[in-house]
UniProtKB/Swiss-Prot annotation:
Its EC number is 7.1.1.-. [4Fe-4S] cluster 1 binds at C68, C71, C74, C117. Its main location: membrane. It is a peripheral membrane protein. It comes from Ehrlichia canis (strain Jake). InterPro entries: 4Fe4S_Fe-S-bd, 4Fe4S_Fe_S_CS, NADH_quinone_OxRdtase_chainI. The keyword ATP-binding does not apply. Residues 59-88, 98-127 form the 4Fe-4S ferredoxin-type domain. This is NADH-quinone oxidoreductase subunit I. GO terms for cellular component: plasma membrane. Pfam families: Fer4_7 (PF12838). Keywords: 4Fe-4S, Cell inner membrane, Cell membrane, Iron, Iron-sulfur, Membrane, Metal-binding, NAD, Quinone, Repeat, Translocase, Ubiquinone. Binds 2 [4Fe-4S] clusters per subunit.
Amino acid sequence: MICKKKFLSPIINLFHSIIINCKGMYITLRYMFKPKVTLNYPLEKGPLSTRFRGEHALRKYKNGEERCIACKLCEAICPAQAITIEAQERDDGSRRTVRYDIDMTKCIYCGFCQEACPVDAIVEGPNFEYATETREELMYNKSKLLHNGQVWEEAIDFRIKKNSQFY
């Protein structure tokens, strides 16, 4: 006598595998007609948050004068101790920076330096593409930071105005 379970088992397995394959094809077809989620990165870039923290920059006033007043609050508040500032007093009694260095290999992009600055001199801009070939290129000096400020001034100014309630 042939056991019914042994006879029906391959038939049940066949129907079960057909159902599983149909479910998989249904899911695949459903996603084929939805808009793509993946971006082709170098050619397409997704939107950044207005509070995104990217490459650092030093800003200038519209008349060309540097904003940094050498108060050294950013250097004091930096938890990674990545900022080094040397100041010099001017003839009119005000102070300005002679040396402003940021070691980007130490920086943790916390944004404390930006929050501590009373004149919005140091900011973290919208640039996230700054890969380098050597570590020395990640040691930003004052001229590199001022250059970043000039390049990204419009975007930085827009972000600060848009997020003024958060600063």
